[in-house]
């Protein structure tokens, strides 16, 4: 999964497909993390319709050489995907900012799988009058195949701020995920530790030169 310290180098395409209600883009990102330092290609799509919205992204990490110290082949070493559906049949009611949410996560790397996960819950949208600035908050039940979880939940925030500080074309967006999953980590001296929670965030700053 994408992590903090990723720099968006290039947005390859922005393809509106339905009167600004849908968009697809490709991003090339370089991760400056001390244990990472590789390129990720992200394919992303968001589409609204009368019943809600659909979102997915696929990350391709070009880190084969990082996973195999005996190889200098800078090729695909891992793929991760998320796809989610928000359902909202009550857009004309006082509950219009609330939606039902269903999501799938999973992936594979050269050395290990990223176990399938299913998420179900609710999301709440906060926005200004123009929808240029939005904040989406999710509370989700999360079950991860063959993984121990003290609490089967995930909390997610996704934000977008357009024309930041009044600068036209300057955008600040990103996400933050927090969930419970028992996993091993390694400290600076190589000692393994067991942790029970995961926090991932990826803020991005964009400037549209078009």
Which residues make up each language-model segment?
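Outer-membrane beta-barrel transmembrane domain signature
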Residues: 144-210
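Short loop/turn motifs that connect adjacent beta-strands in outer-membrane beta-barrel proteins
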Residues: 20-23, 51-53, 88-99, 127-135, ...
